[in-house]
Design a protein with these regions (language model features):
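N-terminal pre-domains immediately preceding structured catalytic cores
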Residues: 1-155
Length: 155
């Protein structure tokens, strides 16, 4: 069971495209390699760019499998799943940073790619299941994917 940070809302929801009815026809996809702690952007099955990431720590492992981007927010609001404390979007202590790309949910909690106020955590197993990225990297990636983009997470 995954209990990642809860994403409440966004101060600026972004819907870049409609989700394609044939998801696998999309030329852009992401592959997250948990053991290498890296996300790679593919375009027409060719690797275009790779970024270092933090992955879920023991007990909070990032789920593996095939997913799709279901949420994209700028300045996401975060609620601590244990205390209920809310941190507004854009706040320097917001653990999601300024960009959120959600790709997994159990109907209540979400897992996605996001920035971090702790750049030293990138490259480690440090999250509650999410994929942390350097803030400059998630900002770049945010504009290279869209709703419906395939996300493959491998061990």
């Amino acid at each position: 069971y995954y209990k990642p940070a809860v994403l409440l809302a966004s101060e600026a929801p972004v819907r870049l495209t409609n989700v394609s009815s044939n998801l696998y026809s999309q030329p852009t996809r992401l592959e997250i390699d948990l053991s290498r702690r890296q996300v790679t952007l593919y375009y027409e099955n060719m690797p275009v760019k790779s970024y270092p990431v933090a992955v879920g720590r023991p007990g909070w492992e990032t789920p593996t499998g095939d997913f799709q981007v279901m949420q994209m927010f700028q300045n996401p609001i975060w609620i601590n799943p244990l205390t209920g404390k809310q941190i507004s979007g854009g706040h320097p202590q917001n653990p999601l940073g300024r960009y959120w790309i959600g790709f997994w949910t159990n109907g209540r909690d979400w897992i996605g790619l996001h920035g971090t106020p702790d750049p030293n955590s990138v490259g480690r197993a440090a999250s509650h299941g999410c994929i942390r990225m350097h803030n400059k990297d998630i900002e770049e990636l945010f504009y290279l994917v869209s709703l419906g983009t395939i996300v493959k997470v491998v061990p």
